[in-house]
Amino acid sequence: MATPHINAEMGDFADVVLMPGDPLRAKYIAETFLEDAREVNNVRGMLGFTGTYKGRKISVMGHGMGIPSCSIYTKELITDFGVKKIIRVGSCGAVLPHVKLRDVVIGMGACTDSKVNRIRFKDHDFAAIADFDMVRNAVDAAKALGIDARVGNLFSADLFYSPDGEMFDVMEKYGILGVEMEAAGIYGVAAEFGAKALTICTVSDHIRTHEQTTAAERQTTFNDMIKIALESVLLGDKE
């Protein structure tokens, strides 16, 4: 049944949901990659759609910006609509010199300055990691598509406009591949409620060099990321 934030019914969502931050990107994914897509949510403009990809039922829905927003939507999808796997597909900023614009990053784990997972985990540190099989399937899908993908840790920041420039030095030292705002929260929700999750990001800007991708470049590499996510779902069905 419908929740305060999702006006769908049980069965409207597939067991796998791709989740970009922007609901308009969810609409783009549905219109570009899915067949027979239909809208299943529009509360607060957070659009959700369900269709098929190569015959496989898949849903896509926006999650908004930041851990509080994505935590609400992922929790409700899992506990109220029976979703088993969530794949966040979004953008990130790079800090390492060898990570370039348009690189695809598969988030094996996610560090964070958010306290949300500590609240969930009785004030202890929680290792926010992706599901291993989902990581492996994404890596295999990228290889099959001929797309280079980096695998490693993300950093999920609470502040987009952070005043702490020195923290980027620490991230570089620890080999953080990309900075975004949601992965650690999604991994925490999935762990708490017995689901599986993965984050795949495209590098849209470089925090050190201030380089940014153009709108056209973002769209091209965004499509690559979506192809990896969708093909990884099909590989997961073969397990």
UniProtKB/Swiss-Prot annotation:
Going by the entry's taxonomy, the superkingdom of the source organism is recorded as Bacteria
EC nos: 2.4.2.1
| A GO molecular-function descriptor | purine-nucleoside phosphorylase activity
Q: Where does a purine D-ribonucleoside bind?
A: H5, E180, M181, E182, S204, D205
Q: Which annotated residues bind phosphate?
A: G21, R25, R44, R88, V89, G90, S91
- Give the UniProt entry's GO cellular component terms: cytosol; membrane
| UniProt effect for mutating R25A | Severe loss of catalytic activity. 20-fold decrease in affinity for phosphate
Site feature location: Important for catalytic activity: R218
Q: Which reaction does it catalyse?
A: a purine D-ribonucleoside + phosphate = a purine nucleobase + alpha-D-ribose 1-phosphate; a purine 2'-deoxy-D-ribonucleoside + phosphate = a purine nucleobase + 2-deoxy-alpha-D-ribose 1-phosphate; inosine + phosphate = alpha-D-ribose 1-phosphate + hypoxanthine; adenosine + phosphate = alpha-D-ribose 1-phosphate + adenine
The active site lies at D205 (proton donor)
For this entry, list what GO says about its biological process.
Answer: DNA damage response; purine nucleoside catabolic process; purine nucleoside interconversion
Pfam families for the chain: PNP_UDP_1
Q: For the modification N6-acetyllysine, which residues carry it? A: K27
Q: How does activity depend on pH?
A: Optimum pH is 7.1 for deoxyinosine as substrate. Optimum pH is 7.5 for inosine as substrate. Optimum pH is 8.2 for hypoxanthine as substrate.
What SUPFAM superfamilies does the database record attribute to this sequence?
Purine and uridine phosphorylases
Q: Please describe what this protein does.
A: Catalyzes the reversible phosphorolytic breakdown of the N-glycosidic bond in the beta-(deoxy)ribonucleoside molecules, with the formation of the corresponding free purine bases and pentose-1-phosphate. Acts on 6-amino and 6-oxopurines including deoxyinosine, deoxyguanosine, deoxyadenosine, adenosine, guanosine, and inosine. Does not act on xanthosine. May also catalyze a phosphate-dependent transfer of the pentose moiety from one purine base to another.
The record ties this protein, via NCBIfam families, to:
deoD, PRK05819.1, PRK13374.1
Which PANTHER family does this UniProt record tie to the protein? PURINE NUCLEOSIDE PHOSPHORYLASE DEOD-TYPE (PTHR43691:SF2), URIDINE PHOSPHORYLASE (PTHR43691)
Q: Which family is this sequence assigned to?
A: Belongs to the PNP/UDP phosphorylase family.
Protein name per the record:
Purine nucleoside phosphorylase DeoD-type
Q: Which organism is it from?
A: Escherichia coli (strain K12)
Gene that produces this protein: deoD
